[in-house]
């Protein structure tokens, strides 16, 4: 794979997309969906919805799917059955979803992997065209974690020094998909810091976190909300934040820029979708149901507990499409610079 020259990244417009990620206030929360109720169109839905989740139940997607399903049910009375279909960094779940009836009874949770997959291969579903985004409800940054009781290193500088001494034998738990946000970011980090690290692949969150906890890997790449329980329990600690400034909740943790890395960070976003061919009146009801669910106390408490109020996490359908389309363009530029076969 061709070496990425980090100085090129500013030309890709990551500063512009980061500004969009940060758009909106992250101060006092104000619900942007004022309509507290909506009549069911021709009785839809008359039964429970199904939510396909293309990742395991323990990771970030599993957690947000559970929280959003609870919020939607709480204010509409409509039950949602979650169907986890992990594998292929989201491709298994996406394939299953696109094969389901486009009647509005099946919705999809997905992350930025859907955008990056389409950026690499345009035959893959485009989340802003083949799907209708109901709501983007999480936008967040990533960190690198170590065990709190680790004795070989205790911060980024000592970790980087130790990694260099291992001659390429050090390991980090990450997702499996080449070209994903996580993999691309790790490539940026290793090139900028001059490190050689073996990335050990896990598509499900639980084994990924267990690998660090049990000592099978030396570090973990993840988002803070996904490992909140390990942080609160004192099991994991962050040593590097991949963001342009230090979030107040991690004020003592250096950013990649603090450590001399100049690339613009790629951020994780998660949301909910319905098939583009679903009946329009059903789509309208689902948009209201999911966007209003974002405002529910249970969901707001969930997002706050996952550090999801540091960045404005809310996008309605129009805002989600802008975010997705910008992301596709940015990833496509990065992949070309990486020498990947962009189709």
Q: What name fits each language-model region?
A:
Residues 39, 72-74, 96-106, 118-207, ...:
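Hinge/capping helix and adjacent helix->loop/strand transition within the periplasmic-binding protein
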Residues 29, 33-34, 46-48, 191-195, ...:
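An extracytoplasmic/periplasmic, membrane-proximal ligand-sensing/linker region
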Residues 60-64, 68, 93, 112, ...:
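Stable alpha-helical elements in mature extracytoplasmic
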Residues 56-58, 112-113, 147-153, 175-180, ...:
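Short coil/turn segments
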Residues 19-27:
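C-terminal segment of classical bacterial N-terminal signal peptides
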